[in-house]
Amino acid sequence: MIRLYPEQLRAQLNEGLRAAYLLLGNDPLLLQESQDAVRQVAAAQGFEEHHTFSIDPNTDWNAIFSLCQAMSLFASRQTLLLLLPENGPNAAINEQLLTLTGLLHDDLLLIVRGNKLSKAQENAAWFTALANRSVQVTCQTPEQAQLPRWVAARAKQLNLELDDAANQVLCYCYEGNLLALAQALERLSLLWPDGKLTLPRVEQAVNDAAHFTPFHWVDALLMGKSKRALHILQQLRLEGSEPVILLRTLQRELLLLVNLKRQSAHTPLRALFDKHRVWQNRRGMMGEALNRLSQTQLRQAVQLLTRTELTLKQDYGQSVWAELEGLSLLLCHKPLADVFIDG
């Protein structure tokens, strides 16, 4: 199976259409643009009919199979778009998809769109059956480290000259929100017809529309990035996130840190990570936090988190965003006012 990113898709399509395109990921912009690109190239090659089915327990699979088999001398070529359920295909859907793979032909182009599949879902028979004749396009929202490269490529597409400082501002303001980022670049191209995007020009035209989850906040805390952690917290507050969800998300990681710190005095970290089943991609930031924070600081963080939870239990309407900021600074190893630590 050919695996590529959305920015590589156009080049592959120009080489020749495959039997199926699997558009998988969580980013609405990348999914939609990839879908549009496949259908656009297919239309240029005579695929004039486009059919779309949302897959759920009530899907009429016989209608889909009939569509695949309805061939006549005058029938036009057609694309078939299947929208997978949010959690991906279950066993029953896998069976139907396997049947469908046996009905594909040169005048039918299959497009499957959905969230990223798990390893178990990728081992399903239908997925394996498509391996030699399909393209998988990874449509995940770029992480912080990959975002500047995406912005630079997008700017180049629009014939914009973007300096590094301007790129950083765009990433800061629109991380996790590619649709708003793409719209900002298009707006900037209209504002500045010469295509030169300097820092002052970009700062005049952007607004902070980054989108984060509580996990982004926790990751920033583990890495000791106080400025980023406070920015994420501000955006989560503006979006109406529930503080109790932030506290629960942090609590799990904080208690794990406390245990790891205590046990690391006599056991190697790698063995502890294995024992506590810490994912490989989280071990680096966990190690950073353990090296940076003392047992005293971790104990203070647990006390502050517990006190904040009690405040919410006693009065759910009470604002605890100041306490969450205090927690952020404490875990990023910044000096805290005594009011946070001593209560």
Swiss-Prot record:
An example GO biological process term is: DNA replication
Q: Where are the transmembrane segments?
A: none
Q: What is its EC number?
A: 2.7.7.7
Domain of life the protein comes from: Bacteria
The GO cellular component terms are: DNA polymerase III complex; DNA polymerase III, clamp loader complex; replisome
- Write out the ranges of the annotated region (Domain 1): 1-140
Root EC class = transferase
> Keywords in UniProt for this one?
DNA replication, DNA-directed DNA polymerase, Nucleotidyltransferase, Transferase
Annotated region Domain 2: the residues are 141-210
Quote the PANTHER family the UniProt record gives. DNA POLYMERASE III SUBUNIT DELTA
The family assignment reads: Belongs to the DNA polymerase HolA subunit family.
The domain-related comment in the record is: Has three domains, each of which is closely related to a corresponding domain in the delta' stator, despite the 2 proteins having only 6-8% sequence identity. Interacts with the beta sliding clamp via domain 1 (residues 1-140, in particular residues 61-74), fitting into a cleft between domains 2 and 3 on the surface of the beta-clamp. Residues 61-74 move about 45 degrees and 5.5 Angstroms in the beta-delta versus gamma-delta-delta' structure to contact respectively the beta or delta'.
Tell me the subunit arrangement.
The DNA polymerase III holoenzyme complex contains at least 10 different subunits organized into 3 functionally essential subassemblies: the Pol III core, the beta sliding clamp processivity factor and the clamp-loading complex. The Pol III core (subunits alpha, epsilon and theta) contains the polymerase and the 3'-5' exonuclease proofreading activities. The polymerase is tethered to the template via the dimeric beta sliding clamp processivity factor.
Q: What does this protein do?
A: Part of the beta sliding clamp loading complex, which hydrolyzes ATP to load the beta clamp onto primed DNA to form the DNA replication pre-initiation complex. DNA polymerase III is a complex, multichain enzyme responsible for most of the replicative synthesis in bacteria. This DNA polymerase also exhibits 3'-5' exonuclease activity. The delta subunit is the wrench that will open the beta subunit dimer, which has been modeled to leave a gap large enough for ssDNA to pass through.
- Which protein are we looking at? DNA polymerase III subunit delta
